[in-house]
């Protein structure tokens, strides 16, 4: 039997106070701004449209979730919230083409091909990194499966609507995608060291040769599966009776969608030779790789990538953290853009995602990009890579009202995101955040003061 422990009243009050403070801090800092249907008029800002240049002293009207008007001296609709943005900048919401935010176990690495698993099934809408990335001006992310196997799971394109259910965050009608992976991450998963550490048996493939075979085998099976369904559907259309449909295969269905151009391939890769191999496989089976992810040696084969109609999403200045990253250079993205490749900068990190604006600025330093070209690497080009450029990525009338007000030029280290809108609703407001922090500090001080000096109760 456990002994009875008496806790003095003063100590109990202190425990309760601390627990209350922790709970209120966690919930208060994370509560989204209440949804508002009222229009918002942003006045007198420097508007970085990305696709149509810089507009000085310009107004922006957000209404019904869209960018309704752009111009000078716009009239405020009845009931509109008016924000004076004099001296401030407005740009499109940042798009991160490679993220693992909202998911914990990113790899279903038990098989070489796991095209049947879906990231959308495990999205965590309470991940605090959503809020932190909103504070960095990010509005849309491409949540990808990990890179442990040659053909991984299906991705999810997400709008960071903090405080909403996961289903409400899914980008409506975004083209679905799937994650592929080449190189060291796949082979390391199957190394002797990994086997000893996990106690699991080795899984094929263990070499780049094996990765190529896995791809060719998977698409051969997918092509045959597609042919079976095409034949069945054709016979049904002719009116034939007593037909038996092919058995449904959840592994091959997404790969058939790739063959039909209905699903994008986002392929983790580093070395030029392995990227060329994948482009050859795609050519053999008649599909296009939408993006090469990371692609640190992309500059070596920029012409071939452009000819294939493939995009590339890279880091601004990450290299030499593993052997296949040794030949990376900071000029990778500018060189690719020069060759006509739709290139972007991604984070692959909850932390770096909050500073993608600074990564874009590095493209000006390393490669001499213009302001618009640099901003496109974190906005419009990412929208193209995800197939949502008609909705987001630039400030144009009719597009989704995913915009960010910055304290200054977003390409400056001295600037910060002040207000982040998604579909015209505020999901991050810096002044509200600071006021909440101040309130919590005062609450803590009051709780400590209430207990300070009290004499403990002796049992």
Regions found by a protein language model. Give the residues of each.
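Extracellular/periplasmic ectodomains of large secreted or surface enzymes and adhesion receptors
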Residues: 10, 30-31, 37, 419-459
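Bacterial N-terminal signal peptides
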Residues: 13-26
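Histidine-rich, glycine-flanked metal-binding segment
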Residues: 31-36, 47, 51-91
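C-terminal cap of metal-dependent C-N hydrolases
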Residues: 45, 396-440
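Metal-associated gating/positioning segment near the N- to mid-region
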Residues: 85-156, 164
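His/Asp/Glu-enriched, well-ordered alpha-helical/loop segment
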Residues: 105-108, 113-117, 264, 303-306, ...
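Active-site gating loops and adjacent loop-to-helix segments of metal-dependent hydrolytic enzymes
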Residues: 107-123, 164, 177-181, 186-197, ...
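Polyanionic/metal-chelating signatures
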Residues: 134-293, 416, 422, 450-458
